[in-house]
């Protein structure tokens, strides 16, 4: 029986995965779950759906709601954060502005990082405020961070506060798509995935206890071209086809380990992304998740999902367990809580400070690695050395971009934002970078950021 707070619970589809997992985890029944969101409408929706789901599954949980973050944190033992400050529309406008300045599909992770907003300012500020509130109201609680940018955010929190912080993502499950494409039975597949959030690589791949990288090599040599002409690849959703795309295979050839999940798009070389036709060659007919085609498909998918949630919310007779079958969702948040609260040892894929797990990465940089979770806490598993080329051309540059973002944020340094953008191969002059930074910071939703970055 524990106190769990979900900050940003109005993200209904995501929050329902937490509720679903809580309702089927009987060892956590009796827990208090506080749903917090600044939107009363969304809060009412998730509360309604939660109560109905509990009734259908006969789960025993105490549910409270609030629009006040500090009330939600009072005496919490586990805090789940899913907040995206300001929503997604400002980011779409920022992308359009960047394109006018010569940056096709926006400036990516070189300044704003993965869905962080420009300079990640609003997200990082919120993360730090949340952690400071936790130091006052629930200093012994665990913060389970899901909101992006996870890499920058968890590194910042772990350095600047005393809060126990875990970053969680589901991108590493991309290995399942790989195994399925290779025709392997998942129950006989064992992988180790390591790196940074959205930049993870398959360091070990076993099938029935034997090294399975040769099976991947064989597929690439004999079957990849046929697969890329198949209906499964050509007509699949962009976020489902990336894992076994030409981009993924080429990254493996370039850097020595196979990229997993979001890595295929967010850590891939710039020359895969110069224009739509180039993206199509590497990612398939849509150009991948981040192209104008792929992103439009995703936004329509999100909209249809929200409409579906609203329809179920408006229909008291609709079955929640039909929409969300009462089995574990696959997300790791509730298993983390169950492991720590009830001392059930599990190995999970988490973002935690390195502490010598990956060689060549400082101890205070958060890495995404397998970790042992139990009542004793969280202990990362030693990964060791990554290929030198991967370290030099991907890992260290990505780590330095994280450091640039955090330095600019902590010091309010506008010039650092410009200098970070100067490293983008699309930047032709200092004036181009400076004018883009100035225009982005001039947007009304960035007024506070403009004052911060002097």
Segments from the language model and where they lie:
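Short acidic low-complexity segments
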Residues: 62-75
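Hydrophobic or amphipathic alpha-helical targeting/insertion segments
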Residues: 75-83
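Rossmann-fold NAD(P)-binding glycine/threonine-rich loop
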Residues: 89-159
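NAD(P)-binding Rossmann-fold cofactor-contacting core
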Residues: 27-51
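Conserved Rossmann-like nucleotide-cofactor binding loop
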Residues: 12, 41, 173
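Long, compositionally biased stretches enriched for glycine and/or charged residues
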Residues: 183-454
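Internal, well-ordered domain-core segments that constitute the primary functional module
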Residues: 130-214
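N-terminal Rossmann-like dinucleotide-binding module
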Residues: 2-29
């Amino acid at each position: 029986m524990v106190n769990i707070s979900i900050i940003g619970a109005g993200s209904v589809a995501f929050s329902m995965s937490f509720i679903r997992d809580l309702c089927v985890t009987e060892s956590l029944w009796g827990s208090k779950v506080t749903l917090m969101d600044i939107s009363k409408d969304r809060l009412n929706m998730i509360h309604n759906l939660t109560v109905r789901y509990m009734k259908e599954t006969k789960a025993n949980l105490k549910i409270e709601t609030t629009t006040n973050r500090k009330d939600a944190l009072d005496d919490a033992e586990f805090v789940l954060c899913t907040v995206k400050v300001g929503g997604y529309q400002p980011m779409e406008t920022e992308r359009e502005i960047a394109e006018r300045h010569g940056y096709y599909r926006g400036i990516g992770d070189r300044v704003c990082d993965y869905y962080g907003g420009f300079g990640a300012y609003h997200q990082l500020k919120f993360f730090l405020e949340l952690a400071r509130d936790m130091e006052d109201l629930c200093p012994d609680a665990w913060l389970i961070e899901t909101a992006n940018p996870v890499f920058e955010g968890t590194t910042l929190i772990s350095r600047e506060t005393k809060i126990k912080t875990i970053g969680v993502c589901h991108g590493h499950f991309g290995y399942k798509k790989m195994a399925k494409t290779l025709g392997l039975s998942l129950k006989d597949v064992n992988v180790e995935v390591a790196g940074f959030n959205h930049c993870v690589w398959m360091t070990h791949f076993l099938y029935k206890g034997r090294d399975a990288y040769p099976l991947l090599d064989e597929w690439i040599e004999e079957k990849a071209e046929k697969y890329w002409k198949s209906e499964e690849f050509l007509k699949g959703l962009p976020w489902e086809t990336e894992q076994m795309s030409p981009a993924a295979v080429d990254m493996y050839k370039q850097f020595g380990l196979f990229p997993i999940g979001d890595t295929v798009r967010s850590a891939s070389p710039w020359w895969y992304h110069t224009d739509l036709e180039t993206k199509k060659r590497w990612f398939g007919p849509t150009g991948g998740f981040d192209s104008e085609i792929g992103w439009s498909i995703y936004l329509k998918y999100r909209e249809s999902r929200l409409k579906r949630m609203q329809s179920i919310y408006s229909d008291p007779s609709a079955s929640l367990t039909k929409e969300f079958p009462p089995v574990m969702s696959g997300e790791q948040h509730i298993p983390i809580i169950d492991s720590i609260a009830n001392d059930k040892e599990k190995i999970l894929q988490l973002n935690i400070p390195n502490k010598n797990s990956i060689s060549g990465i400082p101890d205070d940089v958060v890495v995404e690695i397998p970790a042992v979770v139990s009542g004793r806490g969280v202990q990362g598993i030693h990964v060791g050395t990554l290929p030198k080329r991967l370290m030099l051309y991907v890992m260290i540059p990505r780590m330095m971009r994280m450091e640039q973002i955090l330095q600019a944020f902590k010091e309010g340094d506008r010039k650092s934002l410009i200098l970070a953008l100067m490293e983008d191969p699309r930047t032709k002059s200092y004036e181009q970078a400076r004018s883009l930074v100035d225009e982005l910071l001039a947007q009304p939703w960035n007024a506070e950021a403009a004052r911060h970055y002097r």
